[in-house]
């Protein structure tokens, strides 16, 4: 049996009461998994899969390419996409963000 290397976690929270939002970022080797949830009914509403790449206009700068999946009726894309793209570009890591806030 292979021994698993423990992943590193970073946790954060912001807001109060029903407006409180939580996030956990977990390093998985060279990649990053981000979970964002909060409100009265935490859930999985949208998933953003983001990869850093050289910008087409300024190759010395990092940009990103994303694919997003939204579960029917959910509008969490803006949170998942924004967080994944900013983190992927800043950290130069493939990033998957899962978001669900009600």
Write out the residue ranges for each language-model feature.
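Extended amphipathic alpha-helical scaffolds
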Residues: 1-11
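Conserved mixed alpha/beta catalytic, RNA-binding, or beta-rich assembly cores of soluble enzyme
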Residues: 10-102
């Amino acid at each position: 049996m292979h021994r698993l290397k423990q992943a590193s976690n970073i946790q954060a929270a912001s807001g109060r009461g029903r407006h409180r939002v939580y996030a956990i970022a977990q390093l998985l080797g060279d990649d990053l998994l981000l979970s964002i949830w909060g409100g009265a009914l935490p859930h999985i509403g949208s998933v953003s899969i983001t990869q850093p790449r050289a910008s087409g206009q300024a190759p010395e700068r990092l940009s990103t390419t994303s694919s997003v999946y939204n579960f029917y009726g959910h509008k969490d894309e803006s949170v998942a996409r924004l967080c994944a793209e900013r983190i992927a570009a800043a950290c130069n890591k493939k990033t998957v963000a899962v978001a669900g806030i009600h």
